[in-house]
């Protein structure tokens, strides 16, 4: 079974001084870089996903800005595929599924940002497209959320979404556990 790494939205706007800084993006990016190194060393396929905002739907990832660029810690090599998306689901209106099929990919190892948006939406869609998924949770990051007067800390958001994916949609692991 061909396994590919899917690195989602590890982009400058999610880091300190970016327009949508997350909680601990550096730690997630560092772990994603370890996964990237592993996949490159084994010659397995690597796919990067880059979100570019269209219109005024979000205040970050605007075209032709430094914030939209893929972070230097996981910058794609020339031979690696970059999928551009405009919605949280990396399969929606993109050629991701076709590119994965061209490579014979059946299983995805997913990492990136944000846990509660693009990671969640993409993993659920991947399963609907017939892929087996693993999510490397400490190579993902998110942010604190609010609903009415309730504040939900980023750590709680992250683990709630990882727990929701674990089992039916994915096997959720740490970087260390995956690399063993």
UniProtKB/Swiss-Prot annotation:
InterPro entries linked to this entry: Isochorismatase-like_dom (IPR000868), Isochorismatase-like_hydrls (IPR050272), Isochorismatase-like_sf (IPR036380)
Protein origin, superkingdom: Bacteria
Protein name per the record: Uncharacterized isochorismatase family protein YddQ
A GO MF label: hydrolase activity
Similarity comment text for this entry: Belongs to the isochorismatase family.
Documented EC number(s): 3.-.-.-
Entry keywords, A to Z: Hydrolase
Hydrolase in keyword set: yes
Keyword Cell cycle listed: no
